[in-house]
Amino acid sequence: MSATSTRSSVTRKSSLSKSSSSDKSAKSSSNSSKSPTAASGNKQKMQYTKTRERMVDDVPLPPTHKLTMSEVYDDPKTGKPNFDALRQHFLLEGRIEEAVALRIITEGAALLREEKNMIDVEAPITVCGDIHGQFFDLVKLFEVGGPPATTRYLFLGDYVDRGYFSIECVLYLWSLKITYPTTLSLLRGNHECRHLTEYFTFKQECIIKYSESIYDACMEAFDCLPLAALLNQQFLCIHGGLSPEIFTLDDIKTLNRFREPPAYGPMCDLLWSDPLEDFGNEKTNEFFSHNSVRGCSYFFSYSACCEFLQKNNLLSIVRAHEAQDAGYRMYRKNQVTGFPSLITIFSAPNYLDVYNNKAAVLKYENNVMNIRQFNCSPHPYWLPNFMDVFTWSLPFVGEKVTEMLVNILNICSDDELVAGPDDELEEELRKKIVLVPANASNNNNNNNTPSKPASMSALRKEIIRNKIRAIGKMSRVFSILREESESVLQLKGLTPTGALPVGALSGGRDSLKEALQGLTASSHIHSFAEAKGLDAVNERMPPRRPLLMSASSSSITTVTRSSSSSSNNNNNNSNTSSTTTTKDISNTSSNDTATVTKTSRTTVKSATTSNVRAGFTAKKFP
């Protein structure tokens, strides 16, 4: 709802109130001759003055009742949540009790924790890509892909962030996982982590709709999500892509996934890497190159993909992670098998309400692969950053209140301004008078000596005029703030990033108007490529929190941990080392040790980027 529509509603209300007396008299005089049309018109007018009725009555009011434990877990025999009741309640923007949400999340996490890093799934199955908090499109996805009771599903991650219904997606998918633990599989995406959910919208959404404890429970559950799936022993299904440190499928099985994804390394690559833009038509022979679009991980080439497939006896790699105009993309075929070496699936239609893209799911059955596309579904509107309508309307209310006050004060004439001063005004007058020095008569030749007021009435007039001027200035300031607030919200709504264009605030109102002229309906985003280009900044890994500095500004403290012992379970690393900032590749100690070292900034940077990249950029699979 814009301020324009709000003002028009207020105008209608005021006009109705002004004519209410005349309407009543007309109604009493011509009650017998009143036509049905006039009666319906009066009834329609009166609707605008009823504060308990919704202006847009075709949008149902969200339910205030939160589903209880007995309403969600309504079958004591199965002990499983009623996902149908959850779906219907979430479609109405309803919520559930926090204890119910915690139970769903923890029970789902317990099931995910028991699964391996790479799970085995069999056809027939429906493979789905990114969801990104678009719950109403997730419901449409199940309509297209088939009911979960009779259809196997594999989701490739990115269930949260960017959209405003992320927690509904998590609770609904987790309830399906509890109900169908063997036929519905969930993988981890790059957004299922603390770093991105704090930077984007999921944490804020959890706090607004529930509490921070729900967010913490979700983060623990995300740490349990598997990293990959092997479909029919033919297709490797992951969220991102290949890694220069992963040569075989066994390398995935030995990773420690129960943690926050690091900023580099094989786990990061599985979640963040992308194929080259010119995949299949590369001009270099490098298998991996730095991913400048994401700001982390790598681009992998067609040659790297084909060699990985050949070494692991696979047919293709199925991944998500990148928005696609058609909802999917088939890359260059493998020359050996004649099958696409890489397939990307994206299941969030009209991504961010700006991309205008289709969504797709991949159905694999009887050795036949079908792509089913679908369009977006209507969903309720949320103001940016979950702003409520009262916060949004404060600039408008402030402007109108000060405008009313100025109009009231301007009604007084000059004679009324000096009539009957109150105690506060008298006190202010005394302060004005005592400012005149006592020896003013002895310094008549001193030009700097202030003169006494000509009269009490003139001083009263001047004081009140100054107050009116101050309120008038305040009114103009509120008006400017309200206009700029509307411009900022409009700009955020026109950009896929939800952020203002660079420099939009630097020049004040003029720069905001110029930015709006560049993003008006006449020059709106015309293509998928244009939207993707504007959103590129949000596809990068956000900057991480700065490391703790030591006493010397030229060094930082880092902790390295080396381990040569075998892992406690099949998901931990064996004979590998995990580091917070630097990599320990010596493995000289036979016991677990923690070493504190001081290194320069350049050393840390080279250890985390240059050295790692140089070791694997052109390295082929053994």
From Swiss-Prot:
Residues 1-40, 550-606 have a biased composition (Low complexity). Zn(2+) binds at D158, N190, H239, H321. It comes from the Eukaryota. Its EC number is 3.1.3.16. Residues 1-74, 545-606 are annotated as: Disordered. Binds 1 Fe(3+) ion per subunit. Calcium-dependent, calmodulin-stimulated protein phosphatase which plays an essential role in the transduction of intracellular Ca(2+)-mediated signals. Many of the substrates contain a PxIxIT motif and/or a LxVP motif. This subunit may have a role in the calmodulin activation of calcineurin. GO terms for cellular component: calcineurin complex; cytoplasm; synaptic vesicle. The record marks W392 as: Interaction with PxVP motif in substrate. Keywords: Calmodulin-binding, Hydrolase, Iron, Metal-binding, Nitration, Phosphoprotein, Protein phosphatase, Zinc. The active site is at H191 (proton donor). This is Serine/threonine-protein phosphatase 2B catalytic subunit 1. The modification Phosphoserine is found at S527, S567. Composed of two components (A and B), the A component is the catalytic subunit and the B component confers calcium sensitivity. GO terms for molecular function: calcium-dependent protein serine/threonine phosphatase activity; calmodulin binding; calmodulin-dependent protein phosphatase activity; metal ion binding; protein serine/threonine phosphatase activity. Belongs to the PPP phosphatase family. PP-2B subfamily.
